[in-house]
From Swiss-Prot:
Residues 1-10 have a biased composition (Basic residues). Keywords: Cell projection, Cytoplasm, Cytoskeleton, Nucleus, Phosphoprotein, RNA-binding. The modification Phosphoserine is found at S99. Its main location: nucleus. CDD domains: RRM_Rrp7A, RRP7_Rrp7A. GO terms for cellular component: cell junction; centrosome; cilium; cytoplasm; nucleolus; nucleoplasm; small-subunit processome. It is found in: Nucleus, Nucleolus; Cell projection, Cilium; Cytoplasm, Cytoskeleton, Microtubule organizing center, Centrosome. It comes from Mus musculus. This is Ribosomal RNA-processing protein 7 homolog A. GO terms for biological process: blastocyst formation; cilium disassembly; protein localization to nucleolus; ribosomal small subunit biogenesis; ribosome biogenesis; rRNA processing.
């Protein structure tokens, strides 16, 4: 068997890599020291006729089986030899729509997807997709010039990133809230201008504004509301939950009725004793 393998290798005949229909398998390694490669399955992004998708089909490469250690930066670097890359997006499952472009935050990041992912790589030109599908590989995720942290080094880096600068965090939150308040004020001003103005079909949009002010969205206000709801539930829950609790409540109620009855009897006797007989 060993001799057959050597002959097959010497003859240059390589077995085809099994891959899903319509996909091209490209080997990828974490580093040059790794012997067994992992495989990325790539194809041009296509959708069924009549299905809407925001990804440009002629310039988008769809990739399956992306390992957890392969980040957007490393995937972009591995495929940069195929052409200029516009965007790289990793997702938990296939999606027909691009994620909305929002300003990146220094502190608030989307939750990382555990396990394997799918990727959408948008090239500047359609030729980049064709070049990526013809790659032979293996692609290297971590190189000497672009090291990808793993193991304890990654844990240390993640811990250091979790320690935030309070002043910088406050400035970012203040800037976000200022932009949010400005947006809400513009929407209210626009709604006030359009109030009572009929549209093209002659309909008038009626909006209702409550007299009571809305509770402030602060942590203290939220805690007060939660504490109030907790006390309200505590009064309702577990009341006469067990049979013995129901019996004790009933006995206490009867005892209170007897006590009240005796007090009423004494008060009536006292009133009778104080009453005087005056026939004339």
């Amino acid at each position: 068997m060993v001799s057959r393998r050597k002959k097959r290798k010497a003859g240059g005949h390589e077995e085809s890599i099994p891959s899903p229909p319509g996909y091209s398998a490209v080997p990828v390694k974490f580093s040059a020291k790794q012997q067994a490669p992992h495989y990325l399955y790539m194809r041009q992004h296509r959708v069924r006729q009549g299905t809407q998708s925001t990804w440009p089909p002629d310039r988008t490469l769809f990739i399956l089986n992306v390992p957890p250690y392969c980040t957007q930066e490393s995937l972009s670097r591995c495929l940069s030899c195929c052409g200029t890359i516009k965007t790289v997006e990793l997702q938990e499952k296939p999606d027909l729509a691009e994620s909305p472009t929002e300003p990146k935050s220094q502190f608030f990041h989307p939750k990382p997807v555990p396990g394997f992912q799918v990727a959408y790589v948008v090239f500047q030109k359609p030729s980049g997709v064709s070049a990526a599908l013809n790659l032979k590989g293996p692609l290297l995720v971590s190189t000497e010039s672009h090291l990808v942290k793993s193991g304890i080094h990654k844990w240390i880096s993640d811990y250091e990133d979790s320690v935030l600068d309070p002043e910088a965090l406050r400035m970012e939150v203040d800037a976000f809230m200022e932009a949010y308040d400005k947006k809400i004020a513009e929407e209210e001003a626009k709604a006030k201008e359009e109030e009572g103005v009929p549209d093209e079909e002659g309909w008038v949009k009626v909006t209702r504004r409550g007299r009571r002010p809305v509770l402030p969205r602060t942590e203290a206000a939220s805690l007060r509301v939660l504490e109030k709801e907790k006390r309200k539930r505590a009064r309702k829950e577990l009341l006469n939950f067990y049979a013995w609790q129901h019996r004790e409540t009933k006995m206490e109620h009867l005892a209170q009725l007897r006590k009240k009855f005796e007090e009423d009897k004494q008060r009536i006797e006292l009133m009778r004793a104080q009453r005087k007989f005056r026939p004339y």
